[in-house]
Amino acid sequence: MENVGDGSAAAPVDSYRLTEEIQLEKNKKEMLQMSTFELKNTIAELEQRLNSVEDEGNEWKTRYETQIELNKQLERQIYILREKSENIRGNPTDRLSSIRSLDQMPVGALNQFVKHLDDEKILLENQLKNFELRIEQEAKAYYKVNNERRMYISEIAQTSVTQEAAKKQQSDPAHATREKPAFKAKYNGLAKRRTMTKRRGGMTKGSHPSNMKH
């Protein structure tokens, strides 16, 4: 009878342990599937937009939408972790029962459960490092693009000043270019008249000696 009692006591413990492990595996599988699905969609969208990026506005729009997707993914993971923490906390009775179930677990099952928790911890740490790396890369890209944007703004400002100066120069010499041919014609006319006057004067002076000889 004692053996039967021990078996009946061990059965709920094993059932609870298996249920808890199955639930943890389901949660882990859901997280991985969700992360994989969202990352695939994000990569596909980025590859599609990479071919269609034409200006800085589209690039920043892509970065903004990517960051929104990452934020949504983090929010979902936070929600799942909160649910897990609430399930672990529960009410005092549930906590005591979980403690008793852990106390009654065999050493092998406890080691397996601890290993599962360690694997989940490593998974979360890797995800955290991945997000930190992405944030660092996005920050570097932001500063780079921001510096380029400032440089472009400076070049645009200088070009605008040069363009305004060119417009003023084009508006001022326009009047001078219209008057220049007339002035040149007048000058040429005066020069021709002076030349003809000099020639006539020379011919007049040259005719006086011939008249005196006769």
From Swiss-Prot:
The keyword Coiled coil applies. InterPro entries: DUF4600. It holds the Pfam family DUF4600. Residues 191-202 have a biased composition (Basic residues). Residues 161-214 are annotated as: Disordered. Keywords: Coiled coil. Residues 30-144 form a coiled coil. Residues 165-182 have a biased composition (Basic and acidic residues). Belongs to the CCDC169 family. This is Coiled-coil domain-containing protein 169. It comes from Xenopus laevis.
